[in-house]
């Protein structure tokens, strides 16, 4: 039967604690700008919330409030349907 070594916590590599402590506070760009409704025709703004592979970036990463995230999802999907934005990264923007 195989024997297992006990893991020694002292030999683990140390993490850089400064990079873990300093995280930029996320804020909602639409709240700051006073936007009431996100427009699907504003392609430049919508591109900021789409990843390189074409996926919509979640609110926990962008800091967007829930009401604006729902509007953003709808606007991106409309822009994709009207061929203003690509569905995937295989297409040129």
Swiss-Prot record:
InterPro entries, per database record: Ribosomal_bS18 (IPR001648), Ribosomal_bS18_sf (IPR036870)
An example Gene Ontology CC term for this record: cytosolic small ribosomal subunit
SUPFAM superfamilies, sorted: Ribosomal protein S18
Keywords for this protein: Ribonucleoprotein, Ribosomal protein, RNA-binding, rRNA-binding
Keyword Ribosomal protein annotated: yes
Molecular-function annotations in GO: small ribosomal subunit rRNA binding; structural constituent of ribosome
Gene Ontology BP terms: translation
Keyword Ribonucleoprotein: yes
PANTHER family named among the record's database cross-references: 30S RIBOSOMAL PROTEIN S18, SMALL RIBOSOMAL SUBUNIT PROTEIN BS18M
Function: Binds as a heterodimer with protein bS6 to the central domain of the 16S rRNA, where it helps stabilize the platform of the 30S subunit.
Family in the record: Belongs to the bacterial ribosomal protein bS18 family.
Subunit structure, interactors included: Part of the 30S ribosomal subunit. Forms a tight heterodimer with protein bS6.
Protein name: Small ribosomal subunit protein bS18
Species assigned in the record: Acidovorax ebreus (strain TPSY) (Diaphorobacter sp. (strain TPSY))
Upper taxonomic lineage: Bacteria, Pseudomonadati, Pseudomonadota, Betaproteobacteria, Burkholderiales
Gene that encodes it: rpsR
